[in-house]
């Protein structure tokens, strides 16, 4: 079976930026990939649609996925509140890596980040579970709206999302 592909249609201050397509590595991290896939489809009654990228740091990453508090303090997984680190097989090798944000070991929920550079210092701390396959131009546009402290200079929203 092939790995699932999902998408985000993203806007900044209500202006469409385009689509980001991501391949989820269910072959390596099936539980983590399934969590993200189901949050993209919203099939459990909650998910990423309408959620923001609340933290954007140029030359580092874009972070989103807090659909409960909308500020980086919330979110939840399809397995309950938090779930364990599945494995650290995949590494942060360059721009476009999709990885779980966390608050320490075994605290994965719904928050994720997309890297804009190689982030090898995060290997063994954050679970990489996919990669951007289309729309790196959209990722770069979002990155350009970031700031050194992470506060975006625009309201960046996932207007629609799902599985392809």
UniProtKB/Swiss-Prot annotation:
An example GO BP is:
protein folding
GO CC annotation: cytoplasm
Q: Give the principal location in a single coarse category.
A: cytoplasm
Where is the PPIase cyclophilin-type domain positioned along the sequence? 7-163
Q: Which UniProt keywords apply?
A: Cytoplasm, Isomerase, Rotamase
Give the Enzyme Commission number: 5.2.1.8
The organism sits in which domain of life? Eukaryota
Swiss-Prot/TrEMBL catalytic activity? [protein]-peptidylproline (omega=180) = [protein]-peptidylproline (omega=0)
Is Transmembrane helix tagged as a keyword?
no
Q: State a single Gene Ontology molecular function.
A: cyclosporin A binding
The disulfide bonds in this chain are none
The enzyme's main class, written as a single word, is isomerase
Question: What subcellular compartments does it reside in?
Answer: Cytoplasm
For the keyword Cytoplasm, the answer is yes
How, per the record, is this protein's activity regulated?
A: Binds cyclosporin A (CsA). CsA mediates some of its effects via an inhibitory action on PPIase.
What PANTHER family does the annotation carry? PEPTIDYL-PROLYL CIS-TRANS ISOMERASE, PEPTIDYL-PROLYL CIS-TRANS ISOMERASE D-RELATED
Q: Which family does it belong to?
A: Belongs to the cyclophilin-type PPIase family. PPIase A subfamily.
As for what it does, the entry says:
PPIases accelerate the folding of proteins. It catalyzes the cis-trans isomerization of proline imidic peptide bonds in oligopeptides.
Q: What is this protein called?
A: Peptidyl-prolyl cis-trans isomerase A1
């Amino acid at each position: 079976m092939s790995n699932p592909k999902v998408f985000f249609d993203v806007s900044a201050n209500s202006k469409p930026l385009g689509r980001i397509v991501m391949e989820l590595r269910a072959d390596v991290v099936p539980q983590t990939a399934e969590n993200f896939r189901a949050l993209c489809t919203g099939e459990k009654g909650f998910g990423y649609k309408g959620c923001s990228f609340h933290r954007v740091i140029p030359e580092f990453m874009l972070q989103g996925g807090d659909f409960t508090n909308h500020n980086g303090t919330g979110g939840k997984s399809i397995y309950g509140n938090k779930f364990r680190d599945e494995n650290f097989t995949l590494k942060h090798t360059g721009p476009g890596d999709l990885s779980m944000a966390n608050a320490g070991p075994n605290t994965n929920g719904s928050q994720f980040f997309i890297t804009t550079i190689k982030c090898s210092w995060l290997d063994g701390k954050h679970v990489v579970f996919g990669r951007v396959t289309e729309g790196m131009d959209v990722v770069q546009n979002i990155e350009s709206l970031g700031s050194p402290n992470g506060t975006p200079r625009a309201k960046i929203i996932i207007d629609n999302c799902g599985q392809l």
